[in-house]
Regions:
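Distinct, well-ordered alpha-helical segments
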Residues: 76-84, 105-116, 193
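Long, low-complexity, intrinsically disordered polar/charged segments
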Residues: 109-161
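Conserved C-terminal portion of the radical SAM core fold
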Residues: 123-126, 163-204
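Acidic (Asp/Glu)-rich catalytic clusters
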Residues: 53-56, 83-90, 112-121, 131-138, ...
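Canonical Radical SAM [4Fe-4S] cluster-binding loop centered on the CxxxCxxC motif
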Residues: 1-40
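Short, surface-exposed connector motifs at secondary-structure boundaries
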Residues: 89-95, 178-181
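Core AdoMet radical
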Residues: 28-48, 52-76, 91-104, 138-165
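Structural recognition of alpha->loop->beta junctions
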Residues: 22, 86-92, 197-204
Length: 204
């Protein structure tokens, strides 16, 4: 995955939901040096590929990882431009989109489903190392859920509840889009039993 900064912000920082962000939020702490919003997506991809080739020398294809802040927090037409720009890079075979569960809607998810089945970008293809040809990109949505407990979500100033997260995951999965979920186990106030119960809820 090549980490990208597409210049997004977050509704929990700009005043739409809250200000200051979540209590633990520090995007700069996990930014690679090549990933800065002042560079084009293609430049970030080129530099990210060069960075990773030191370790993964035989890798031919990459996923563009929209990681910084909430990467569906923009009008749909803007998202289309950004996602399709990343997918136009010849070594990119798919997208991983990190976002908040309160930053998706039916229209955005319908578009992502169309990307995933190939109908949004007809003619897009990639020759794979095993001799096959992909006619649709990989599309994965990763939600920052963090906790199953509303009391914890309030404590960390998350700005949404667990019902919102569950609904977003179900809406995404119902469209056949691959879904990932980020949790932070052991947040202040959570017990071992709560963590085990969280695992059970995640597995549902």
């Amino acid at each position: 995955k090549i980490v990208l900064d597409a210049g997004f912000t977050c509704p929990n920082r700009d005043g739409t939901v809250g200000r200051g962000g979540c209590t633990y939020c520090d995007n700069a702490a996990f930014h690679p040096s090549y990933s800065t919003a002042g560079k084009s997506l293609h430049q970030q991809l080129d530099e990210g590929i060069e960075f990773h080739m030191v370790r993964y020398r035989t890798t031919e294809h990459y996923l563009a990882y929209f990681q910084s802040f909430s990467n569906t927090y923009a009008p749909l037409e803007r998202l289309k431009v950004l996602y399709e720009e990343a997918l136009s890079h010849p070594k990119v075979v798919g997208l991983v989109i990190g976002t908040r569960p309160d930053c998706v809607d039916e229209q955005k998810l319908d578009y992502l489903a169309a990307l995933a089945d190939g109908s949004a970008m007809p003619g897009w293809s990639r020759d794979m190392a095993d001799g096959t040809v992909r006619h649709a990109p990989v599309v994965i949505v990763e939600y920052g859920i963090e906790s199953c407990y509303d009391s914890t979500l309030r404590r960390i100033n998350r700005g949404h509840d667990f019902v919102t997260a569950r609904r977003a995951v179900e809406m995404t999965a119902a469209r056949g889009i691959d879904v990932g979920a980020h949790f932070i186990l052991g947040l202040p106030g959570e017990t071992r039993q709560m963590m085990l119960e969280s695992c059970a809820m995640i597995n549902e």
